[in-house]
Amino acid sequence: DRNTGEDKPVTIGQLQRHAVDWLYENRVQPFKRAASTGKKVAVIGAGPAGMSCAHRLSMLGNQVTVFEAKEKAGGLNEYGLAAYKMVDDFAQKEIQFILSVGGIEIKYGQALGKNVSLAKLRKEFDAVFLGTGLSGVNALEIPGEDLPNVFDAVDYIEGIRQNKKQRVGKKIIVIGGGNTAVDISVQSKLLGADDVILAYRRGSEQMGATWKEQELAQKNGVLIKHWIKPVQIKGDSKGVTAMEFETTKIENGKLVGIGERFTLECDTVFKAIGQVLVPKDLGDAPELLSIAKGRVVVDAEMKTSLAGVFAGGDCVNGGTLTVDAVQHGKVAARAIHKMLGGKNG
């Protein structure tokens, strides 16, 4: 009522966090599992999609085994979000909260194609959910991309999150327009970089980063340059020294360069232009699954082309928001439960 009276929006995110923090601090578990169905489901990947699916399946009485390639669960919430956005080991607290409902086991160091086989899982479990995420990085496809001190933003952020000593340059250029580009830009400033330029080939309205994220970057001293695209990275065996750009515009609905070029000095370049699905993400699955445009093809219930195999999250939509991945997991869990003869999914 107070917010309404002052014509201010309700801060839904803060309200949700207040409620969740109270549950965590008081170790209250409001969910209760249904009676056991006797069914077993394998979930590949302990990110938002996988853990959402596992939680809903467990709530419905199914036994779930989660196979996670890394040493910790959480996916990009644990490894890919900037450190300044996360507090008090929140991702791991969330995982423990999910596990406390019961019926979920996580096996770490288990990756498709290495020590986990989709064919074997299909035989041992009643259903399988793929939430593998994306491990490949889009290439700039320009000269100099392989020079020292050209980094993938997500990998660099992962190093920071896992308390690895990460060197930060003084003059940094970030290529991209999404939230990850903002994350690495702001994180670099917080780590002591003198100048950080975020370069994006289109305008601010076309950026994947929200207005709030763009504003956050600018408040932290990040200079955002629009309508420029990278042409080449200059440097030598010791590292990067500069980056050449060309100004761009939209012509007949397509992005084109207009011939005007300029160079910006830098000692570090971060690529934040999205991740892609690569064969190793799916182990032995690519030969079996329907893949289109670098994504696993699913229907409205998150079913893949393989009977009994479902998928969700970044490997399906190419990488959007956490809430989308969580919703994928919920939808898949209901469909799996229904397929296995369950009710009230």
Language-model regions, residue ranges each:
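Iron-sulfur cluster-binding cysteine motifs and their immediate structural context
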Residues: 1-19, 65, 103-104
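Residue-level detector of alpha-helix initiation sites
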Residues: 6, 47-49, 72, 178-180, ...
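Glycine-rich dinucleotide-binding loop and its adjacent helix/turn
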Residues: 18-35, 96-109, 114, 137-191, ...
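Feature captures the FAD/FMN-dependent oxidoreductase FAD-binding
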Residues: 35-36, 40-44, 92-142, 232-244, ...
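N-terminal Rossmann-like FAD-binding beta1-loop-alpha1 element of flavoenzymes
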Residues: 39-65, 181-189
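Rossmann-like dinucleotide-binding cores of NAD(P)H-dependent redox enzymes
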Residues: 66, 70-100, 106-107, 160, ...
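FAD-site-proximal beta/loop scaffold in flavoenzymes
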Residues: 146-169, 252-319
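A conserved FAD-binding loop/helix module that cradles the flavin
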Residues: 184, 315-343
